[in-house]
Each structure stands twice: as structure tokens, then as C-alpha cells.
Amino acid sequence: MIEIEKVCVDFTAGRGTPTRAVDDVSLHIAAGEIFGIVGTSGAGKSTLLRTLNALTRPSQGRVNVNGVEISALDGKALRQARQRIGMIFQHFNLMHTRTVAQNVAFSLKAAGWERSKIAPRVAEILTLVGLADKANRFPVQLSGGQKQRVGIARAIANHPDVLLCDEPTSALDLETSATILALLRQINAQLGITIVLITHEMNVIKSICDRVAVMSGGKVVESGEVFDVFAHPQHAFTQQLVSHTLNLTLPERLREHLPGQLLKILFIGDSAEQPVLSEVAIKFGVAVNILHGKIEYIGERALGILVVQLTAPHNPTAVAAAVEHIRQRTAQVEVIRG
């Protein structure tokens, strides 16, 4: 579906030294998947996204969409290719003097639709995004979430193959963000549209994406299935993002003063639902104190992370045996202290 091959993007201000915003990025995005690109501000993710519809041209490398090298197109050929690629934005980009229906109809008129077919399509797509009763409202009369729904309706009205999402929830509150992400999942499942989404929030990636690329300093430092990236982050930057998202940092006071061993335990799949710690307490006679933890469901797979304290003041070898038992029954054990 989408092939990004060794893409670099340089920006030059005046006669200054070029700044490399995207540095040698190669990615394959399969048809029908929801692919996330995550990174902090300045990581290059927005610039990379804009190469997919040639709003930004690569300085080096190629971008192919549906077998067509879009980075090499211009004029009429580029306009035709862009009709197969919808895009939504962080700040909605609606025309404030036009109604909801007129905003959606505009994209169809620009694509050359017959006048008689525009109104039925607008009604159909507004029903899909839950705005059938808002067709004659103006953007100023809408909430932020409703404005983004108009943006989505406009972007998918022309039956695109690809939907590019540039920070689609960053201007919204948590509850509204969840409804927008649910709508994007519905559109992906119902219409089969490939979605490429950029965000600075790993929670967004966790809730909607099939695969993810992590960007830092213009480079993709890690990529893979979302569950695997959360369960086994390889790059230090990814580890930082995941740790912040799962919020498993212990106060230093606890790390320094609690007796016994402190462990961070990763449970994957079935092991997340097994009574491993109860077994340890009974079998080895150790005291188990759960300090922090949670079980996340990413897709349909469980990922459990616990921070626990193990103590057995009168039988130190029991703690070591308990740790080994936990290692055998879980995916990963990290000794934080002890």
C-alpha cells in the first residue's frame, strides 16, 4: 500500500545550513491497517506524514502509494493521486462561513462529482460520523469533537484509500478523544481505509493502532506491532515513552528504604491472568507486597506490569527461589533493587 524508501527531508532558511527534519526513513504500511507514528515535538513525524500526499517533497528517497511514486508526480497526475488520500488536521481547518454539509460537499465538488450525487453522499457520510442532525449548523456552533467529525467526513467523502491523521485528538479532551478514536476504528473496519496517524501520545497508539513507528531526531528508532513495542521496547527513547505511559515510576523514598527485593514483572497473555504471586507466597513462604501495577489490554492481548516487594527475613534463599519461579512463569523480571 505505502512504501517509504530512504526518505530524507531538508529545510533551508535563507543561506543557512540545511536542517534535516526526516533522516533516512524507510517504512512499509500495509493496506487496511492503522499505522501510528509517535514522537515528541520536532521529531519529524508531521513532515514525514506530509510526504505521503506530497504536501512536502522528499529531498532524497521515494514515497509510493498504491504502486504510484507520488513523490515524483505533479500537476494533474498529483491532483488525481491526492483524491485517493484524505487528511484530517489537529485544528480541523473548516470553512467557518459554510455549513457542515457545505464543508463536506466542497471536497466532492473539488473532486468533480456530479451535482446530483453530492447531496446524497453528504447525507450518507454525515450519518456515518454521527452528524446527520448537524448538517445545517456552522462550525462556530459545534464542539471540538463535532468539528473533528466534520473534518473526518470531508476527508473520507470521496472514497479515499488512505486517511492521514495529523494529531487528530491533541486539541480535544480525553473523553472526546476516545470517541474520535472509536470513530476512526469504525471507519477503518467498515470502509477498509488505511489510516496513518501521528501523535505524541502513546495512549493514542495503544488504543487504536496495529503497528507503530517511533521517531526521534528525524529518525525511526523503533517500529513493530504495538503490543510488542509496549511489551519489549528496545530503544531508550521508546522505553521512556512506554514507562511514562504506563506510569510505573516508584518514588525514590520507596526504592531506598523498603527491605527485601524490588522486582518489576512483565506478564504477557495468559500469564497476566494467572495467580503467580499467590503461588510464590504459598510455595516459598515469602511476603509479597504489590507496590504498583496494572493490566492493559492492547487489542485483545493482555499486558500486565507489576512492581512488587519480596521479603523473607528468616529465609533469604526463599526470596531467590521465588524470583526464579516468577521468571519461569512470566515474560520478564527486572530486579530493581536487592
UniProtKB/Swiss-Prot annotation:
Membrane topology: Peripheral membrane protein
Catalytic activity field: L-methionine(out) + ATP + H2O = L-methionine(in) + ADP + phosphate + H(+); D-methionine(out) + ATP + H2O = D-methionine(in) + ADP + phosphate + H(+)
Domain of life of the organism encoding this protein: Bacteria
Cellular compartment(s): Cell inner membrane
InterPro entries: AAA+_ATPase (IPR003593), ABC_transporter-like_ATP-bd (IPR003439), ABC_transporter-like_CS (IPR017871), ACT-like_dom_sf (IPR045865), MetN_ABC (IPR041701), MetN_ABC_transporter-like (IPR050086), NIL_domain (IPR018449), P-loop_NTPase (IPR027417)
The entry's keywords: Amino-acid transport, ATP-binding, Cell inner membrane, Cell membrane, Membrane, Nucleotide-binding, Translocase, Transport
Cross-referenced SUPFAM superfamilies: ACT-like, P-loop containing nucleoside triphosphate hydrolases
Principal localisation: membrane
GO molecular function, one term: ATP binding
Annotated residues for binding of ATP: 39-46
Disulfide bonds: none
Residue intervals of the ABC transporter domain: 2-242
One Gene Ontology term, aspect cellular component: plasma membrane
Known EC number: 7.4.2.11
Subunit structure of this chain's protein: The complex is composed of two ATP-binding proteins (MetN), two transmembrane proteins (MetI) and a solute-binding protein (MetQ).
Record's function text: Part of the ABC transporter complex MetNIQ involved in methionine import. Responsible for energy coupling to the transport system.
Family membership noted in the UniProt record: Belongs to the ABC transporter superfamily. Methionine importer (TC 3.A.1.24) family.
Name assigned to this protein: Methionine import ATP-binding protein MetN 2
